[in-house]
Each structure stands twice: as structure tokens, then as C-alpha cells.
């Protein structure tokens, strides 16, 4: 089961370590820019500005979290974030990150989009988000 974590940091850094650690580490959310493992070089990733220090919950999905009726794994994005004190009509953000070579960006763009759509559909199917939630998808 995935754990919900909370932060009020002014900046959140969503980083995909998968390629750089040969899958030892995966996606992580940090409040300070992390370094590429075993270097002093900062990792690239998604930076979310939280200037008002809103309390934000976030969940990083594991590889076995999403399954269809037959128990088969369905594609999904990396994580979601939402206000800690959210209500039925609040926003939710789904994120998919690919740490890839520039030549692969065009290929991964459609894959990312498909993963985001699949995750959002699954959340709606299981009534985890309603039609009144404002949904953001970030690649």
C-alpha cells in the first residue's frame, strides 16, 4: 500500500532516480534539490513552487498499485499531490516523469500521456476523485 506524506515546504522537487540508479531508487519527492548519486551535481526534475507553504499531501505509487478486474497491472503515473485539507471540489495533481535521453522524448511523450489518463480514469472509477475535482496532469 502507498503511504501519504505531507509537507509545507516552499518548493518540492520530484525526481526520478530510476535510470541513474539502475532501478535501486525510483521517484522521490524532496524539499531540497538532491544530487545525482555519487556526485556533487544536482539532479534535474520537476520543481513545484509552494510560495504560500500550503500543506500538501503526496503519494508515490508503487509498481503493483494499479490492477484491473483480472488482477493484471495497468499503467499508471508516478505520483499525485493534493491539499491536505482538501474537500471534494479541491484540486489534485498527477505527475509522470521520464529521465531520458533527448532522442527518446517524442516516444515517451505519448507514453506519459497514456499513463496519466489511465491513472485519472482509475481514480474516477474507484470514486477517489469526483467530477468536481480540478485535475492537473504534469509531464
PLM feature segments, named:
Residues 1-72:
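Basic, amphipathic N-terminal segments that precede the first structured/catalytic domain
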Residues 79-81, 91-100:
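Conserved catalytic cores of phosphodiester-cleaving nucleases, focusing on short active-site segments
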Residues 39, 69-89:
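Histone-fold modules and their flanking histone-like tails across chromatin and transcription assemblies
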Residues 106-139:
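Catalytic cores of nucleic-acid endonucleases
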Residues 71, 100-104:
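Short acidic, S/G/P-rich loop/turn micro-motifs used as interaction or catalytic elements
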Residues 64-67, 80, 102:
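A contiguous catalytic/ligand-binding core that recognizes phosphate-bearing ligands
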Amino acid at each position: 500500500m502507498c503511504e501519504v506524506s505531507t509537507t509545507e515546504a516552499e518548493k518540492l522537487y520530484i525526481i526520478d532516480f530510476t535510470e541513474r540508479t539502475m532501478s535501486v531508487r525510483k521517484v522521490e519527492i524532496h524539499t531540497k534539490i538532491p544530487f545525482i548519486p555519487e556526485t556533487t551535481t544536482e539532479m534535474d526534475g520537476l520543481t513545484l513552487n509552494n510560495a504560500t507553504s500550503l500543506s500538501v499531501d503526496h503519494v508515490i505509487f508503487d509498481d503493483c498499485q494499479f490492477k484491473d478486474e483480472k488482477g493484471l497491472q495497468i499503467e499508471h503515473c508516478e505520483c499525485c499531490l493534493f491539499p491536505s485539507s482538501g474537500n471534494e471540489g479541491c484540486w489534485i495533481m498527477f505527475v509522470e516523469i521520464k529521465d531520458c535521453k533527448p532522442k527518446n522524448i517524442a516516444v515517451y511523450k505519448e507514453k506519459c500521456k497514456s499513463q496519466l489518463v489511465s491513472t485519472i480514469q482509475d481514480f474516477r472509477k474507484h470514486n477517489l476523485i469526483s467530477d468536481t475535482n480540478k485535475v492537473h496532469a504534469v509531464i
